[in-house]
């Protein structure tokens, strides 16, 4: 858990609100919304941060989580039985606020369709009206989203023709780094990559252990095809989608689908570089290793291969972003943290 990663902190608060732990009384005494209790913990953290005592700060955050959230979860597990007759309320991870949530979520869906989905063989997007109908959003939302894709460099609107799109392997336009939305989402891409780096080991192990044989055979087939066609650029995405689609935990699937969506924002930056990076040998080695381990049903081999390549690619991605002009402090932009639960219809 990285407390200096704003996206990780956003996820922490979102899951805490979803569980309702912020509003639970503990032993009839204090609760997590107790302002003096929260201020006391915050003061200790601030003091440790001022003195740059990072080890003790990490311990303070860990202890607070265990004393509060950990104890609350244990109490819930022992006193509340799940109801088999009621449908569970799914966890929804809201990274953005208000309209940007719809616009940026649609942008991620369109990027998926452009790179690996239904638009991957096309040169132009469907009309605004068709996209509006297909994705269930207003035409004005489609228009704002396409503008964002233009700024990102993944698309180019041409008067009288439509919106040109640039698929995998095609050089695309240079992202407009003057656009706040582009810079913000590239920061989220970086933060999502870091979340993946710290969590993929446990998630991949659990997913492989729980996945049906047919699901693992499908992943093996995808990776084999990538090697045969010489197109291994997407194999990390395929593993990410495997976890997002087949984890046994709904919450993990939700989180990893969001990580995948944020991942897509980073591709146009790489594809736009005039003297772009050479194909990274590690990704081909990773693909071949994973194929071997899947054939041998070697879960730990797959997990270690994924962990290694994600760490390597994360370091490379950070270098890309810094060389393209983003500042280190920008990569830590604070996403919205919803501290109040409001009526969704208001």
Regions found by a protein language model. Give the residues of each.
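Short, structured interface segments
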Residues: 1, 11-23, 60-83, 163-172, ...
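Regular secondary-structure segments
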Residues: 39-50, 111, 115, 204, ...
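A ubiquitous short alpha-helical element
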Residues: 4, 24-34, 94-96, 183-189, ...
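Short linear motifs at protein or domain termini
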Residues: 84-195, 346
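C-terminal all-alpha effector/ligand-binding and dimerization domain
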Residues: 28-86, 269-346
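Long, mid-chain structured domain cores
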Residues: 1, 33, 44, 48, ...
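Conserved amphipathic alpha-helical segments that form helical-bundle/coiled-coil interaction surfaces
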Residues: 1-23, 60-68, 213-269, 304-313
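Amphipathic alpha-helical dimerization/coiled-coil segments
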Residues: 182-216
């Amino acid at each position: 858990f990285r407390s200096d990663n704003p996206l990780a902190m956003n996820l922490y608060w979102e899951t805490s609100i979803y569980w309702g732990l912020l509003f639970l009384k503990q032993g009839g005494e204090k609760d997590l919304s107790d302002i003096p209790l929260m201020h006391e913990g915050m003061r200790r953290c601030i003091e440790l941060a001022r003195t740059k005592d990072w080890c003790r700060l990490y311990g303070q955050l860990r202890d607070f989580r265990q004393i509060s959230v950990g104890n609350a979860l244990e109490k819930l597990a022992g006193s509340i039985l799940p109801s088999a007759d009621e449908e569970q309320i799914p966890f929804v991870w809201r990274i953005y606020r208000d309209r940007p949530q719809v616009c940026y979520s649609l942008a991620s869906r369109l990027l998926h369709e452009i790179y690996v989905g239904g638009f991957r063989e096309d040169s132009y997007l469907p009309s605004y009206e068709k996209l509006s109908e297909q994705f269930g959003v207003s035409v004005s939302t489609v228009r704002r989203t396409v503008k964002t894709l233009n700024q990102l460099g993944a698309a180019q609107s041409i008067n009288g023709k439509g919106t040109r799109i640039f698929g995998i392997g095609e050089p695309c336009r240079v992202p407009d780094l003057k656009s706040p939305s582009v810079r913000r989402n590239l920061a989220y891409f970086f933060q999502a990559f870091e979340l993946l780096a710290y969590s993929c080991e446990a998630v991949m192990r659990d997913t492989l252990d729980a996945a049906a044989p047919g699901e693992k055979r499908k992943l093996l087939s995808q990776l084999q095809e990538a090697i045969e066609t010489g197109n291994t650029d997407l194999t990390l995405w395929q593993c990410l989608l495997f976890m997002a689609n087949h984890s046994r935990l709904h919450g993990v699937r939700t989180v990893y689908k969001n990580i995948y969506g944020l991942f897509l924002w980073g591709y146009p930056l790489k594809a736009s570089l005039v003297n772009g990076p050479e194909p990274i040998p590690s990704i081909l080695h990773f693909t071949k290793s994973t194929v071997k381990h899947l054939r041998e049903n070697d879960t730990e081999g797959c997990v270690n291969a994924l962990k290694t390549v994600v760490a390597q690619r994360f370091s490379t991605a950070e270098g890309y972003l810094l060389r393209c002009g983003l500042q280190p402090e920008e990569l830590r932009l604070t996403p919205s943290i919803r501290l109040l639960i409001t009526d969704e219809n208001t």
